[in-house]
Amino acid sequence: MKFVDEAEIRVEAGDGGNGVIGFRREKYVPKGGPDGGDGGDGGSVFLQADENLNTLIDYRFERFHRAERGQNGQGSNCIGKKGQDLTVMVPVGTRATDSDTGEVLGDLTRHGQKLKVAQGGFHGLGNTRFKSSTNRAPRQKTNGTPGEIRNLKLELMLLADVGLLGMPNAGKSTFIRSVSAAKPKVADYPFTTLVPNLGVVRQDAQRSFVVADIPGLIEGAADGAGLGIRFLKHLERCRILLHVVDIFPVDETDPADNAKAIIEELEKYSPKLAQKPRWLVFNKVDLLLEEEVEERCQHVIDALGWEGPVYQISAFQKMNLDPLCNDVMDFIETLPAETEQEEEKKEVEFKWDTYHKNTLEAHDEFEDDLGDDLDDDDWDEDDYDVEVEYRR
């Protein structure tokens, strides 16, 4: 199936049902009082993460999603049925952003996690809500409010523990083939990898981590060169980055310049991402003599001013891969659990929330005036009358 990691959709919550004007009319109860019911709330729209999905391609063709409208109220104080909520299934790792305001509504990082993205309309009030000691036969009602409408940008960001970073043909895909069961395409030309790939590295039955391989970066990627930097977002949730450096490039470029270019593009994309733990991994050491390997590696380290961990491997020959994977596994296990790292998320403010609260507060005073039950037969006593004048 084609990998699609971005899609734009429009979600529309259901409108609230209208309240009605009604009066109780039964035999021997000629003036039974108001009994118009409230409408039902409109259905809301939710996103839910599903681990069985791995692409957003469905939403390239299915862009409009609408929840059900609330039913209108009825007589006998019958409240309208609430509109059915709509749940849109998305892959785990999806981020929802309001396209119009740029507000990030939330990230869905766990299977089954739900996120409300459009609030259903508030129900209209029936005339029963407006009765009081001075308004015994109210003819007022309110209509339901419209449901919220949002244009959403969905971005799928892969969930992985380790992210591979480097130039095209640095050997990232070969690395992931050697340490996991993933089989990404490998060839002797740049940009063989066009979409991200995931692989699971198993140290033993109980210990494993996930590696993400993204298409290679080149100088000027931030300005659109090559495949650009759109795939760097898949590294945002990684806990550690492996910067793979080809010490024997086929185009005879300087490995130090290549490594600098990658770091610069990373910082242009996101300073926060550039601050993640990053290890330097020199690949293709089997193609040079040991003295040349040490010389070239030291040249890159000096050019970068590097002080972090350094590894020398050959992904093709599977040389020195076990020590690297063991150290990565040990490092990941020392990090706090992801749930502990999560920051408090801001509550999403929906369009009609303030209106709902104000409307309910405005009518609370009427509830306090109700001394009798709504179904009391002596609600409308004989010692008063209400005159209604109709005009054409």
Swiss-Prot record:
Residues 121-146 are annotated as: Disordered. Gene3D superfamilies: GTP1/OBG domain, P-loop containing nucleotide triphosphate hydrolases. GO terms for molecular function: GTP binding; GTPase activity; magnesium ion binding. Residues 160-333 form the OBG-type G domain. InterPro entries: G_OBG, GTP-bd, GTP-bd_Obg/CgtA, GTP1-OBG_CS, GTP1_OBG_dom, GTP1_OBG_dom_sf, OBG_GTPase, P-loop_NTPase. NCBIfam families: Obg_CgtA, PRK12297.1, PRK12299.1. This is GTPase Obg.
